[in-house]
Amino acid sequence: MQRRARGASSLRLARCLTPANLIRGANAGVPERRIFAGCLLPTPEGLLSAAVGVLRQRADDLQPAFLTGADRSVRLAARHHNTVPESLIVDGLASDPHYDYIRHYASAAKQALGEVELSGGQLSRAILAQYWKYLQTVVPSGLDIPDDPAGDCDPSLHVLLRPTLLPKLLVRAPFKSGAAAAKYAAAVAGLRDAAHRLQQYMFFMRPADPSRPSTDTALRLSELLAYVSVLYHWASWMLWTADKYVCRRLGPADRRFVALSGSLEAPAETFARHLDRGPSGTTGSMQCMALRAAVSDVLGHLTRLAHLWETGKRSGGTYGIVDAIVSTVEVLSIVHHHAQYIINATLTGYVVWASDSLNNEYLTAAVDSQERFCRTAAPLFPTMTAPSWARMELSIKSWFGAALAPDLLRSGTPSPHYESILRLAASGPPGGRGAVGGSCRDKIQRTRRDNAPPPLPRARPHSTPAAPRRCRRHREDLPEPPHVDAADRGPEPCAGRPATYYTHMAGAPPRLPPRNPAPPEQRPAAAARPLAAQREAAGVYDAVRTWGPDAEAEPDQMENTYLLPDDDAAMPAGVGLGATPAADTTAAAAWPAESHAPRAPSEDADSIYESVGEDGGRVYEEIPWVRVYENICPRRRLAGGAALPGDAPDSPYIEAENPLYDWGGSALFSPRRATRAPDPGLSLSPMPARPRTNALANDGPTNVAALSALLTKLKRGRHQSH
C-alpha cells in the first residue's frame, strides 16, 4: 500500500506557490491583491540593509578569524561600557602566531618592493650617499666627508619597508667580534617579534562599538602613543651615537667632537621614566599589564642594541664605517616602521576612543616626535602618510566602516560621541588649515588671513556708506545725552580685557559689553571719561558706527583706524582720531599713566590670546560662530523706553551659523533665527538706556555667545592643565 508523504497534499502545495492570505477568505484570488502582495520592488530600507550587509561581509573577509568569531562577540556582549578585557586581547595574540593580522599590508609592501628591485650593493651605496648628505647638514665643516657618488637610484622605499619585512639584513655582522655579531642578530630578531606582538595587541584591543567611548581603550591608546615618543627619543640617540663614531673616524685625531644635536638623555633613563610615569604606570589600572609587558620587551631589546653600539668593537678602515652606517639605518628603519604602524592605525580609526580624540596630547607628542626625527635625519627616513598606509593595510579602515554603518542606518544620524569627533575633524587644526611650517610671524600672518571675517550681508535700508558718516557728524553736534541712573540700566561697561574673538584690523567692529566690569572705585569720573565711554554707559549700543575713516580724513588720522575696538575707550577726550597735537599732549598728561599700559592679562588670569603680531596686535582665538557686523540704525521707542512691536532684537551683532558646526538641532548649535521687521526711518535723537533683556533666555543671543565663550575657555584650560 502506497503511503502519501506528509505535506504533499494539493492544498499544501498551493500554499507553497501562492501566499496563504490569498487562498483563505472570501476575496481569494483577486488580481489586485495578488499584484500588490507580490510586488518585490526594492525599498530604500532594504537597499541600505543590503549595502550594510555587503560592507560587513567584505570587512569580515579581511579580518583574522578570531576578530570575527562568535566567542569574541559573546564575551564582548557580556561587558559593560564598551570595554575589552585584556584576557581577550591576549587570546587574540595567541590565535595569530603567523601574523595574519598584517597579511594584506605585507603583501602590498612586498609587491611594491618587487616593482623597484635593488641589489644589496646598490641599496648600500644609495644609503651611504644619503647619509653623507645628512652628515653635511649636521657637521658643515671640520670633516673630510667623502664625495657624493652618482646616485643611480632612490632607496627610500627599500629603507622604509625592507628591514621589517625581509628576514635577511644587508649587514649581518657589523662588529669585529663574533659574539657581538651574534648578539646583534639575536637582538634584531627579538626586536622584530616584540614589535609584532605590540602591533597585534593594538589590532585586537578594539571594542565592538566605535560610536561609543571606551575608558580602558583610551588608556591603552595613550600608553601606546607615549611609547612612540620614547621610540623616537631612542632613535635620535642611536643616530647621534653613530654620527659620533663616524666623526671620530673621519676627523682629526686631536679634535674632540661634542654632541651634534645637543645633550641627549641615556636610553636607560628614558625607558625607566616612561615605565614609572607613563599613562599606564600612574593610573594603577590592571587592564594594561600585558601591554606593559609587551612594551618592556621592546625596550629591553633596544637597550641591548644601544649597549652594543656604545661598547662594540668595529672593523677598521672603510668597511667598518660602511657597516656602522648601514646597520644603524636598518635598525632605525625597523623602529621607525613600528612607530608608524601605531600612529597610522590611530589616525585610521582608533582615534575615536582616544581622550580628546584628535586633540589628544599623546597623539600630538607622538606625531611631533616623528616629525622632528625625520626632519633632523632627512633624507634618510621617509614617512608614509595615513591614507597611503590605509590603502595597503585594508582591514582596519574597512572594519570601522562596517561597524559604524549599522548604527547610522538605525538612527539616521551619528551618535553624539562620534558626531563630536566629526565636528572636530571638519573644523581643521587650531591654527587653520594652512598654518603649517614657517616662522612664528608667518603662522600669525596665515592665521589672520585664514580667519578673515566673511563679507557683510546685503545692505539694510538707510545704511549707505555715506549715511553713517552724516549721522555721526550730526550726532557730534547734539548735546550730550542725559545721564541715566544706575538703577535704570544694566551693569555699566568698562575698559576690560579684549574679547575672545578675532578682530579684523582693517575696520573696528562695534564693541561688545565687557565681561568683567571694574569696581566703582577704579572707574574714572563721568566727566573725565571720553565721549565713547559715556555713550556706552548711557546704554546707546545701537548707534550707527563707521567702518573706516572719513573720505576727507588726513593720512595721519587714518592710521588710527587700525586700533583695536577698546583702544578708543581707553584714551581720554582729545586723544586719538581728530585730535590736535596740543590737545593730544594735554589730555594724555592728565590721564592716569596706568591707562596707557599694555592690556596684558595678569599671571593668574586665564590666557585668552593665541599669539602676538609684529605690530603688537592680538590675534584672538575663534569661537564656533561667525559674527557678521552691520551698521545698525537707531530705532524708535515708545514712552518708557519700550521698543516698537516687531522691532529687531537688542543685539549689536548678528549670530550667523557656521556651516562647519551645523550638525545638530540643539539650541547651542542651531539658534532660533529672529525675524527682522523693516527698519523705521532714520532718527537722530539720543536713545535712552537699552534694557538688558533676553540675557538669560536659553536661546537668547547673549546667552549663546556666553556659552560659546565658556566652552572655548574650558577647552583651552583643559589643554593647559595636561
Swiss-Prot record:
<protein>
    <recommendedName>
        <fullName>Tegument protein UL46</fullName>
    </recommendedName>
</protein>
<keyword id="KW-0010">Activator</keyword>
<comment type="similarity">
    <text>Belongs to the herpesviridae HHV-1 VP11/12 protein family.</text>
</comment>
<dbReference type="GO" id="GO:0020002">
    <property type="term" value="C:host cell plasma membrane"/>
</dbReference>
<feature type="compositionally biased region" description="Basic and acidic residues">
    <location>
        <begin position="440"/>
        <end position="451"/>
    </location>
</feature>
<comment type="function">
    <text>Plays a role in the activation of the host PI3K/AKT pathway to promote cell survival. Interacts with and activates host LCK and thereby recruits downstream partners SHC1, GRB2 and PI3KR1 in order to activate the PI3K pathway by phosphorylating host AKT on its activating residues. This mechanism is inhibited by the viral protein US3 that instead promotes incorporation of UL46 into virions.</text>
</comment>
<dbReference type="GO" id="GO:0006355">
    <property type="term" value="P:regulation of DNA-templated transcription"/>
</dbReference>
<keyword id="KW-0472">Membrane</keyword>
<keyword id="KW-1043">Host membrane</keyword>
<dbReference type="InterPro" id="IPR005051">
    <property type="entry name" value="Herpes_UL46"/>
</dbReference>
<keyword id="KW-0804">Transcription</keyword>
<keyword id="KW-1032">Host cell membrane</keyword>
<feature type="compositionally biased region" description="Low complexity">
    <location>
        <begin position="523"/>
        <end position="534"/>
    </location>
</feature>
<feature type="compositionally biased region" description="Pro residues">
    <location>
        <begin position="510"/>
        <end position="522"/>
    </location>
</feature>
<feature type="region of interest" description="Disordered">
    <location>
        <begin position="423"/>
        <end position="534"/>
    </location>
</feature>
<comment type="subunit">
    <text>Interacts with VP16. Interacts with host LCK, PIK3R1, SHC1 AND GRB2; these interactions promote the activation of the PI3K/AKT pathway. Interacts with host YWHAB. Interacts with ICP0; this interaction targets UL46 for degradation by the proteasome.</text>
</comment>
<keyword id="KW-0920">Virion tegument</keyword>
<keyword id="KW-0805">Transcription regulation</keyword>
<dbReference type="Pfam" id="PF03387">
    <property type="entry name" value="Herpes_UL46"/>
</dbReference>
<dbReference type="GO" id="GO:0019033">
    <property type="term" value="C:viral tegument"/>
</dbReference>
<dbReference type="GO" id="GO:0016020">
    <property type="term" value="C:membrane"/>
</dbReference>
<feature type="compositionally biased region" description="Basic and acidic residues">
    <location>
        <begin position="474"/>
        <end position="491"/>
    </location>
</feature>
<keyword id="KW-0946">Virion</keyword>
